[in-house]
């Protein structure tokens, strides 16, 4: 895309800054189409911006960040229709945030492919076979969750790739499945992925616990969860009908402080509130 082309040119020319003009006021704390109270994030690190983009934030084409990151060139993301409004600066050493997280992003349509079996415990090379098989088929995996017992590995893919992924994995492990050592690959659709991102995740204990406590109090079950290798993101898979609710309760918890919005319905036969 044009963002990526601009990034390559900026890196080649050693530009002082890369400006990307889009239709929103930079990166937001959440999707403003879903969360009306979402607001602009003033600064992000390269890693934080990459995580948000990888999990659904469509402000910047994800590969755009790497060429300028290597040359330590800041990125300014501005709104073409609001040039004097708030914007986001992406740089290596972003100013520390006073909040526990920087932002929340989501992938609306997710399928979960699960490879499981007792024979996976302690066996070297099973995951290598899984990822090699999927890579050779051109199937991208954007989240991985493995059980502590090593008996199952769940992979988040696009719904369009889900059935094909199951078929080729069943073919790869056909011998183990025939022997009863592994189960046929399982596939679940109708899911969504949510990611909570911020460098403060690695510095503040209890943030992940708070996240799942909020989800639990609101009756939102989690199907799979993964902690990013850089310890600045937590991603999890939920039922798609619960996505909007999950985004709202998490945004309220982490960004709105003690402020709480209530939906109030009043009815009456006459002038409501007259007495």
Model-derived segments and their meaning:
Residues 1-260:
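C-terminal catalytic "cap/lid" subdomain
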């Amino acid at each position: 895309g044009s963002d990526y082309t601009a990034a390559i040119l900026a890196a080649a020319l050693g530009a002082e800054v890369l400006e990307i003009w889009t239709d929103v006021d930079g990166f937001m704390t959440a999707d403003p189409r879903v969360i009306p109270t979402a607001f602009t994030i003033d600064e992000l690190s390269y890693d934080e911006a990459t995580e948000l983009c990888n999990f659904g934030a469509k402000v910047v084409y994800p590969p755009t960040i790497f060429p300028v990151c290597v040359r330590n060139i800041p990125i300014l993301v501005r709104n073409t229709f609001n040039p004097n409004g708030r914007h986001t600066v992406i740089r290596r050493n972003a100013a520390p945030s006073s909040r526990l997280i920087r932002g929340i992003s989501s992938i609306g349509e997710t399928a979960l492919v699960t490879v499981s079996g007792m024979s996976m415990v302690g066996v070297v090379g099973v995951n290598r076979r899984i990822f090699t098989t999927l890579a050779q088929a051109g199937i991208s995996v954007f989240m991985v969750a493995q059980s502590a017992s090593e008996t199952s590995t769940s992979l988040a893919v696009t719904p369009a790739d889900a059935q094909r992924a199951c078929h080729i994995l069943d073919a790869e492990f056909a011998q183990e499945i025939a022997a009863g050592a592994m189960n046929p690959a399982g596939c679940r659709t109708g899911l969504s992925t949510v990611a909570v991102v911020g460098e403060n995740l690695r510095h503040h204990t209890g943030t992940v616990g708070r996240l799942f406590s909020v989800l639990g109090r609101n009756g939102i079950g989690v199907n799979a969860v993964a902690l990013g290798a850089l310890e600045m993101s937590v991603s999890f898979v939920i039922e798609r009908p619960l996505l909007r609710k999950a985004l709202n309760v998490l945004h309220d918890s982490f960004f709105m402080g003690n402020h709480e919005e209530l939906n109030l319905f009043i009815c009456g036969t006459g002038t409501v509130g007259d007495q």
